[in-house]
Amino acid sequence: MRLAEKYGIVLNAADLAAPKTLHALTGAWFAREHFGVPDNIFSAIEWHTTGRAEMAALEKIVYLADFIEPTRDFPGVQDIRTLAFADLNAAMIRALQMSMDEVKRRGASPHPRSAEALRWLQTQN
C-alpha cells in the first residue's frame, strides 16, 4: 500500500479485494522510476496479474509467462503451456477462465479487468 501511495496509484474496491495483484501496479511504476522502462514494458508489467481488454502481444506473453512458469503445478497448467506455443489468444482465454474459476471457487469475485480481458479475447478468436 505504501508504494501505491508513493506512486499515486488510486486503488479501487476490486484492487483492494485482490491484494495479490497489487504488485503488478506498483511494480510497473517501480520499473519506470528505477529502470526507465518504455510504455510497452510498463503496460506488460502492469497487467500481468489481471489482464485487460485490448492486450498487446507482449502483455499476453508476460501474463502467460507468469501463469505457466515452471514452478506452477495445478491441474491444466501443462495444457496451457502447450497451447501457449500454438495459439496465444486461446491460451489466454483458457488461463483467464481457469484463474477466474479458481477465484470463484474460493468464494471471491474475479477482478473486473480479468472479466473484461476474457470478453475481449473471446471476440478476437
Task: Give the location of each predicted region.
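Charged phosphate-binding loop/patch that engages nucleotide di/tri-phosphates or the phosphate backbone
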Residues: 101-125
